Amino acid sequence: MTLIESIIARAKSNRQRIVLPESLEERTLTAADMALADEIADIILIGNPDEIFALAEKLGLKNIGKATIIDPATSEKTAAYADLLYELRKNKGMTPEKAAQLVLDPLYFGCLIIKSGDADGQISGALSTTGETLRPALQIIKCSPGITCVSGAMLMITQTPEYGEDGVLVVGDVAVTPMPDASQLAQIAVCTAQTAKSVAGFADPKVAMLSFSTMGSAKHEVVDKVIEATKLARELDPNLKVEGELQADAALVASVGQKKAPGSEIAGHANVLVFPCLEVGNIAYKLVQRLGNADAIGPILQGIARPVNDLSRGCSVDDIYKMVAITACQAMDAK
């Protein structure tokens, strides 16, 4: 069974309620139809039912009738959700009038469904920007306890089974926080290890905090940040297996790890890689993807109290379908 097959199987085993607020986007609706047909999640669509069914008929989709469809313009819960939004944001300048307007936005409405306990996760981005996806999530659902920054992990399925977990690595941050400080980097480490467990199914995440230095081989303030982040990550999660700073070869190659970091439990055996900044992470995963012919699944947003994931506006139907399964796995772990 491949990694994505195992993710889908886990999603099927305990179906979660996943909101797809961009319901009139053709790829999204097609992916919803596939997810409903395969029973990987209970899908909630936001929008006018007549318009959604008309698009489904045009696309030849047969399973949309199995979805829960909620129209913010007519839902009996809209007023209560508007009140909830006002209460959550009144100290930030929210007014009842503004809340009544925002609740009609499908992305806000979906996050309010989750906050109210009526759904488990949300996926958008086929039409919306990352900012439009994250803003309601952070305002309504907020970050996980002990976490103050959102980050993005990527599942890297490589052609080299001797690395990571049979060739699978979970890496972060590749998507959100450009220049994390030591505290944020520690949070990214903890969250990426959790993603490795909940989504990739790693029983034993081994986290390497990457740098251009291994265990003091170089001196620089950016190395100091990684060392401090490693210490803080251990404080955040005393059970986390994490070491740093490590160079990439020392983290992945057993013979190199033994030479550069003798006695290390992680060196040469890492399956979770944490990059010192977004610039490095984004470049590194794309190089591995293109030059190493690796499959990259994600980014998977992490650090939010309930899963909210962001798609590329160039995403495929298959990308959205996979993200439904991934979000479902995250939702199980978040409960």
List each model region and its residues.
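Anion-binding alpha/beta catalytic cores of soluble intermediary-metabolism enzymes, centered on
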Residues: M1-A267, V272-K335
